[in-house]
């Protein structure tokens, strides 16, 4: 691992920073409301047709617009999925979904989770994939970025009452950022062999004389926004492990870059908009250090594999189970950490087949709130919540009122911060307990013991933190799990967004105080260390007991027996 593993990590980080820096500058211009002549007429036409006034909104108006927009998206997608059997672009004549699966899927894609309790090629028509899921991939990503825009403006402005206009932000993010970049990525994917057609499925005879069905469809267009918007829902059931969805090592590398591109660019944009690039760099350093350590641990665990294989005559202990040979262990490990550090959930291997330690790291990255770069928008505002918590703890230690970027952090801000940080762990732990205490929940567990517990814990962690990946050994297409996970996804998304916008509404009205002798510098290595420590401390205190019952116990069972 020493040479090739670290070379892969280094090349990934270098290319990521090279691409995200200029995009961060462009996003900063969007946040500050600079006009762009290229699509100004299109934008103006949309306002005329919709009757929307582009006047700025206060925090509660912004939150109400975001919430209503997403609730409407759930209703429309639910109806489409239920009615797909009677609609066009359905060459395989697939019927509509059951009501509980349709509800779960609608909530999943609107909340940017993309949890899939179904296999796309066997369940969804082309119309549902294009007009339903792909559209929500764009809109859910735009929602997360818009909330991040509002919070950044709250730190940059002072003595103000407004955070921007939600409708303007959603449209401009989609028109100027998501659509152009997704088009470029889709063309790259097509060049690598990703499908993009509306043909019916192919029925062929293999060389062995066996009949086989090859699914077709508009894959590349959905795949591009799947990774760019950190959505993660695959066109096929195997997701990015499927050769029609992720055929080459290059397409695999592009997917990983696309997942982190906007989250990293938003950190650069944050520093530029608040007038101190060191603030954005500090966030990137904290995220990068946690990320690199996580990748190294997963690579080590998967290369170490299972010690019981060598005595049985295996050539290597390394764990290739559930992995694609065209990617190998190192690229697969990197992808697993990227997709769970971000709220993406796309997979190019089966996480359920990882070693206990290798599977624990992706699980833990979700449980800390996916703040290591994180989802588009959600990663930045999630890490800024930990920044506020860090300056509060530092203020307690030195006996000063906490402040960040010249703004005092008061009781209301800390209440909302605590609420936003604690809502997802509460859902995860209560949901896991409910699943294990009921017959309907236990019925879906395939593997007994510690790994079966890990499957349930992973499902709730993935849903509540809007990731969408899974330990696929758990059978979740049941009314119990569809409804439980739908509730977890909805509360996990908006139970964080609403407190974040409440914090933004509070901060934007405050005056900016000049830095004094007792002000904690938040752009240096000391603060980066404090921030990392806070993230690790909160994650440890919350989830160590649950992790001890699952992946830690499983890891000890394997190695102590050896």
Swiss-Prot record:
Domain of life: Bacteria
Secretion signal, residue range per the UniProt entry: none
Subunit structure, as described in the record: The system is composed of three essential subunits: KdpA, KdpB and KdpC.
Major location category of this protein: membrane
PANTHER family: POTASSIUM-TRANSPORTING ATPASE A CHAIN, POTASSIUM-TRANSPORTING ATPASE POTASSIUM-BINDING SUBUNIT
Keywords assigned by UniProt, alphabetized: Cell inner membrane, Cell membrane, Ion transport, Membrane, Potassium, Potassium transport, Transmembrane, Transmembrane helix, Transport
Lineage per the UniProt record: Bacteria, Pseudomonadati, Pseudomonadota, Gammaproteobacteria, Enterobacterales
A molecular-function term among this protein's GO annotations: potassium ion binding
GO cellular component: plasma membrane
Keyword Transport: yes
This protein's encoding gene: kdpA
Name under which the protein is recorded: Potassium-transporting ATPase potassium-binding subunit
Location(s), subcellular: Cell inner membrane
Role summary: Part of the high-affinity ATP-driven potassium transport (or Kdp) system, which catalyzes the hydrolysis of ATP coupled with the electrogenic transport of potassium into the cytoplasm. This subunit binds the periplasmic potassium ions and delivers the ions to the membrane domain of KdpB through an intramembrane tunnel.
Topology in the lipid bilayer: Multi-pass membrane protein
Family under the similarity heading: Belongs to the KdpA family.
Transmembrane intervals: 6-26, 63-83, 132-152, 175-195, 253-273, 283-303, 327-347, 356-376, 379-399, 416-436, 483-503, 526-546
Pfam families associated with the record: KdpA (PF03814)
């Amino acid at each position: 691992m020493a040479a090739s593993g670290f070379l892969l990590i280094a090349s990934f980080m270098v290319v990521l920073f090279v691409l995200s820096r200029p995009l961060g500058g462009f996003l900063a211009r969007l946040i500050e409301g600079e006009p762009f002549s290229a699509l100004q007429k299109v934008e103006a036409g949309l306002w005329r047709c919709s009757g929307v006034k582009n006047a700025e909104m206060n925090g509660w108006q912004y939150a109400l617009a975001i919430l209503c927009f997403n609730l409407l998206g759930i209703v429309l997608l639910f109806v489409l999925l239920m009615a797909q059997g009677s609609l066009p672009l359905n060459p395989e004549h697939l019927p509509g979904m059951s009501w509980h699966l349709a509800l779960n899927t609608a909530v999943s894609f609107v909340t940017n989770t993309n949890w899939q309790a179904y296999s796309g090629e066997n369940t969804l028509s082309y119309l549902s994939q294009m007009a339903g899921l792909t559209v929500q991939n764009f809109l859910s990503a735009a929602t997360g970025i818009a909330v991040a825009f509002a919070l950044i403006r709250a730190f940059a402005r002072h003595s103000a009452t407004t955070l921007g206009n939600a409708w303007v932000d959603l449209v401009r993010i989609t028109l100027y950022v998501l659509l152009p970049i997704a088009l470029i990525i889709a063309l790259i994917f097509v060049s690598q062999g990703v499908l993009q057609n509306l043909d019916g499925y192919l029925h062929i005879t293999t060389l062995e004389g066996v009949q086989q069905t090859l699914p077709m469809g508009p894959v590349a267009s959905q795949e591009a926004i799947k990774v760019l918007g950190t959505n993660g829902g695959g066109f096929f059931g195997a997701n990015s492990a499927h050769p029609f969805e992720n055929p080459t090592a290059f397409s695999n590398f592009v997917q990983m870059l696309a997942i982190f591109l906007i989250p990293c660019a938003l950190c650069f944009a944050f520093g530029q908009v608040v007038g101190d690039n060191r603030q954005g760099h500090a966030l990137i350093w904290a995220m990068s250090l946690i990320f690199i350590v996580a990748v190294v641990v997963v690579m080590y665990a998967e290369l170490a594999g299972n010690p019981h294989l060598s005595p049985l005559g295996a050539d290597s202990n390394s764990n290739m189970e559930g992995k694609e040979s065209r990617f190998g262990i190192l690229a697969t490990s990197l992808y697993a950490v990227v997709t769970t550090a971000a709220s993406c959930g796309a997979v190019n291997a089966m996480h359920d087949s990882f070693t206990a330690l290798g599977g624990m790291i992706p699980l833990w990255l979700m449980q800390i709130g996916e703040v290591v770069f994180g989802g588009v928008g959600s990663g930045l505002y999630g890490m800024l919540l930990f920044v506020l918590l860090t300056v509060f703890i530092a203020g307690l230690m030195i006996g000063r009122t906490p402040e960040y970027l010249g703004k005092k952090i008061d009781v209301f801000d800390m209440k909302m911060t605590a609420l936003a940080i604690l809502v997802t762990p509460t859902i995860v732990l209560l949901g896991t307990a409910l699943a294990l205490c009921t017959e309907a929940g236990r019925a879906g567990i395939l593997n007994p013991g510690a790994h079966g517990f890990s499957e349930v814990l992973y499902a709730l962690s993935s849903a509540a933190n809007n990731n969408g990946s899974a330990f696929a050994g758990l059978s979740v297409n049941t009314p119990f799990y569809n409804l439980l996970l739908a509730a977890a996804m909805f509360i996990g998304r908006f139970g964080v967004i609403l407190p974040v916008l409440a914090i933004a509404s509070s901060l934007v009205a405050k005056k900016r105080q000049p830095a004094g002798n007792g002000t904690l510098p938040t752009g240096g290595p000391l603060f980066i260390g404090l921030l990392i420590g806070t993230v690790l401390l909160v994650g440890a205190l919350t989830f160590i007991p649950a992790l001890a019952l699952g992946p830690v116990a499983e890891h000890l069972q394997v190695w102590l027996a050896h």
